[in-house]
Amino acid sequence: MEMKNMQLFADNPTVNVTTDSGLSAENKTFYDRALIEEAQPNLIHGQFGQKRPIPRNGGKRIQFRRYASLPKALKPLTEGVTPEGRKLSATALEAEVNQYGDFVCLSDVLDLTAIDNNVLEATKAVGRQAGMTLDTITRNVLQSGTNVYYCPKVAANGQTTPVTDRQGLDKTCVLTVDVVKKVAAMLKAANAPRIAGDYVCILHPYVAYDIMSDPHWEDMHKYCSPENMYEGEIGRIAGVRFVETSEAAVYKGEGDECPAGLAVFGCLFLAEGAYGVTEVTGGGLQTIVKQLGSAGTADPLDQRSTVGWKALQTAEILMEPYMVRVECCSAFSPTAEAN
């Protein structure tokens, strides 16, 4: 099996064309479902965003809406008099939708009358790749937010020193319960709405290791039923639910302006309505299966079949005050690599 390089397709992203000549509708549905099932667990960063369907015949741009808060209604009502009321103010934010995709080549014969194990395994492999690719695209947008908090330095006597930039971090600048409480307070002060009663933090397993040993840590089974758990959720502390992924941002080296020899982790604290993403279902992510012989003269001996994926994706920050990027080090910072 040979993996091809990632490519950005230049075709019109609104055209929903999948060439699967000869595949039955039943098999096509099966492979589409298998692809999405493999991709879904890797879509950690997109699960808390405002979802928008991909545009149909609407060009390469998608629109998200940001609603302004209403002012307090402090004027007492007069009996029998209807107040003037207010208009709901919405700001439209547009983002460009791009198309991504990749494929693998198979030399085995594709049996179009039954579900083929090789094709299924290839579908699972490209599904995992699709999920990680789309998740990284969303992650990179969210990591570009301007609302940043740097974990303070902690001396041996417990005294803390504020840090004002990434290069100022050192190995003592780890995520603590006190930091979590401060960031939660920042979101509360911004009147940022909670997600199902709590704020959410997406963090790397190396950072999770540092904070899970705190005595106030709650394992997820103690406060949440399995059907209400987020993808990747590991626990809660101080009103913040933590979601773990190895794809959480890790920075390292001079190019990322990191302290010498130490990796820096970007932890995303999120409230409801902080950002928007395109939906994966409904045509946002497609399977493309090409049978042997479908390439014509490009494959004169009918030696190749392919399994691939194609997706439309974008993400957009909608409310900067509703998200905070906390940058910190970890016990694993000396050995962790950038991603």
Question: Where are the predicted features?
Answer:
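N-terminal "assembly arms/tails" that initiate or stabilize quaternary assembly
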Residues: E2-E96, M323, E337
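Hydrophobic alpha-helical segments involved in membrane association or supramolecular assembly
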Residues: F64, K124, R128, C201, ...
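Aromatic- and glycine-enriched pocket-lining scaffold segments that form the walls
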Residues: A192-A208, M212-D214
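Sequence/fold signature of self-assembling virion shell proteins
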Residues: L8-H45, N157, T161-A184, Y206, ...
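Alpha-helical scaffold segments that mediate packing/assembly in large oligomeric complexes
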Residues: L110-A189, E337-A338
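An acidic- and aromatic-residue-enriched active-site/binding cleft used to recognize and process polar
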Residues: Y67-S69, V109, L142, H204-Y206, ...
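Short acidic, glycine/tyrosine-flanked loop/strand segments centered on an H-E-D-like triad
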Residues: K87-A114, G283
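Extracytoplasmic
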Residues: G59, Q99, A196-D198, I237, ...
